[in-house]
């Protein structure tokens, strides 16, 4: 694995003046068991102006707007009767000591919690130990790697994690494969490391089961005939693949475990790393269903069923040589403003990332770490409590996805064949493909339609805005990315869908003119 690391990352050293060198100690030397600290430039916790924090935690997304009681209830202890979800939730009552109020004090004796004396202090570059332990336990539960020499490091969110992963693998001039439509800010991380992004064609067939994102045959052929197909790269082989394998941004496609296995086998054969960006993967989604159907408590999955049959295993679970690095974030499941995530990979990879972190970011925010860790451990109840929260998020996102897609599917624009809709199996995005007549100047008509959509009052993202190489992807750039995450209510989603399809319908009636 070490041969794939960048020369820049491999050459970094650790350096700190307070590290004592015990080499060549005089005979008979024994370190004092409890020395006094007169070396560290750290203020004593008594100087911190904050004595305690109280965090009030909800049981369910949108709990306040639904007027649900605070009960610290889990999905698995709800009464699974044939009752509508909202009605059942409103009947919940608090029993026993509430765990909806998390108190963070200056000091605690609970080894799983982070107190203010630790959270407000300088801390380890790798992350505060309690949160690090949670990240490792989560990976063991949800995506256990096949080898033992793996570990995690806390990051300042997925963007920071991606920047550090690119630095770990890419030297100037190194080639990295990227899905042709992607989270384009990552291109800046690649550029910062000096890498060369090469787009991989996606299969944008919206028919259910017809596509898993990456066009595998295209990828396979590209690798088999690399020198002939990419002569301008002067026989530089790909060093890595960057992929959003679940709920792909922007398309919404999700790769099955069988598909991932085929891609991983290519990585072994052609010796490249896989950088797996997974901000949305825990938000698995069932196929679209009527949004007006009253869902029952029994529709909730158990944690075991979710892990066994719904959560797609990470590339980590296939990795036998340490070539997979997984980027996780708390942004989509907790809160993005905390700027907190973590990276999973082989210890050699995490070591070079740790050395880079020591230069560019040092440790992540201690306040963010204590909020996330203590809410999960004290209110949710550890790893399974966190997964229980994920299932509640999943349920809410499923309903929202159904509301938005229902508005699209019921439209005249859809029934007339003006558009197709990708039904996502994970995440917070769907893509709507506009079916222009053959020979249409797609970029120009997408530009005009974008103005039409803004004029009717709906903001979406044009597919070509998320292309790695617009000239390469122009034939497949006839889509818009829509999200069901930011809207404040189901009525906003319905109105957004209504405005979108009305603009498309009018655009086609006017002969593809504004």
Please name every model-derived segment.
Residues 170, 438-448, 490-494:
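Short, conserved charged micro-motifs
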């Amino acid at each position: 694995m070490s041969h794939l690391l960048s020369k820049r990352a491999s050459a970094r050293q650790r350096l700190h003046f307070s590290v004592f060198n015990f080499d060549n100690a005089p005979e008979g030397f024994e370190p004092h068991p409890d020395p006094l600290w007169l070396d560290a430039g750290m203020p004593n916790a008594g100087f911190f102006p904050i004595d305690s924090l109280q965090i009030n935690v909800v049981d369910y997304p949108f709990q306040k707007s639904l007027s649900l009681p605070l009960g610290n209830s889990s999905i698995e202890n709800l009464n699974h009767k044939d009752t509508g979800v909202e009605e059942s939730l409103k009947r919940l009552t608090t029993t026993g000591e509430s765990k909806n109020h998390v108190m963070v004090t200056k000091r605690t004796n609970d080894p799983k919690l982070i107190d203010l004396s630790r959270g407000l202090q300088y801390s380890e570059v790798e992350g505060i130990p309690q949160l690090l332990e949670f990240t490792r336990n989560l990976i063991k539960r949800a995506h256990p790697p096949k080898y033992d020499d793996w570990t995690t490091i806390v990051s300042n969110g997925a963007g920071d994690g991606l920047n550090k992963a690119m630095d770990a693998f890419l030297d100037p001039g190194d080639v990295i494969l990227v899905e042709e439509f992607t989270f384009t800010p990552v291109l800046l991380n690649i550029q910062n490391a000096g890498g060369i992004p090469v787009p991989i064609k996606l299969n944008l067939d919206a028919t259910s089961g017809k596509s898993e994102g990456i066009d595998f045959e295209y990828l396979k052929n590209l690798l088999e005939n690399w020198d002939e197909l990419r002569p301008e790269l002067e026989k530089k082989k790909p060093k890595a693949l960057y992929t959003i394998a679940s709920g792909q941004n922007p398309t919404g496609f999700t790769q099955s475990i069988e598909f991932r296995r085929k891609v991983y086998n290519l990585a072994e054969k052609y010796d490249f790393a896989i950088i797996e960006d997974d901000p949305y993967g825990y938000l698995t989604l069932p196929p679209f269903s009527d949004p007006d159907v009253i869902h029952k408590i029994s529709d909730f999955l158990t944690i075991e069923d979710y892990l066994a049959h719904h959560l797609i295993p990470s590339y980590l679970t296939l990795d036998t040589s340490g070539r997979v690095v997984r980027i996780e974030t708390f942004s989509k499941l907790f809160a993005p403003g905390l700027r907190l995530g973590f990276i999973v990979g082989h210890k050699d990879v995490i070591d070079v990332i740790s050395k880079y972190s020591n230069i560019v970011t040092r440790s992540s925010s201690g306040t963010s770490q204590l909020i996330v860790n203590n809410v999960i451990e004290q209110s949710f109840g550890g790893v399974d409590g966190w997964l229980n929260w994920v299932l509640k998020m999943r349920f809410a996102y499923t309903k929202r996805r159904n509301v938005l897609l229902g508005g699209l599917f019921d439209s005249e624009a859809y029934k007339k064949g003006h558009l197709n809709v990708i039904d996502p199996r994970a995440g917070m995005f769907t893509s709507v493909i506009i079916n222009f007549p053959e020979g249409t100047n797609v970029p120009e008509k997408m530009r005009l339609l974008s103005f039409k959509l803004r004029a009717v009052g709906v903001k979406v993202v044009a597919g070509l805005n998320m292309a790695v190489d617009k000239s390469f992807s122009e034939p497949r750039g006839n889509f818009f990315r829509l999200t069901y995450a930011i809207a404040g209510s189901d009525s906003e989603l319905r109105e957004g869908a209504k405005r979108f399809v009305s603009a498309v319908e009018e655009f086609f009636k006017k002969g593809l003119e504004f």
